[in-house]
Amino acid sequence: MASSPDSAPTYLEGVVTSSTGSWYDVRAEGRTIPSRIRGKFRLETEDVTNPIAVGDRVTIRLTEEDDTGFITKIHDRVNKLSRRAAGPRTGQEHILVANVDRIWSVQAVEFPAFNPRFLDRLLVAAAIHDIPAGLIINKVDLMTRDTAPRVMD
């Protein structure tokens, strides 16, 4: 599907579905295309640890050799969830996910125990970025009189 040496390069628009090191899986035209980021994106984004996140809409140029791609453009984000980077990159932003339609938190009543602190943090982050959020409570058959107040409050 890549272009021949005497033809124009093939460009596709897609969505990043996973990120592993310097490789990104981009879903475009019904298939997943392993793609790399161009070096200029890393140099232009010193304030973030990762210039591309899962959920980003991107344009890729297919390579002629092995049907992989090079990410040539990152489209504007509708929203994102991020946190401060840890370790030596403290002060930088680490983007967790981009272009989120909705956030669902699935929490068990027990095993593992319901975690209201995590839920609070998630709901606050969603509200800050105007992302609709919801809660799914799993393992309700394990709810007892002791666990009910912790979950229901």
Tell where the protein language model's regions lie, with residue ranges:
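Conserved C-terminal guanine-recognition region of P-loop GTPase G domains, centered on the G4
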Residues: 90-153
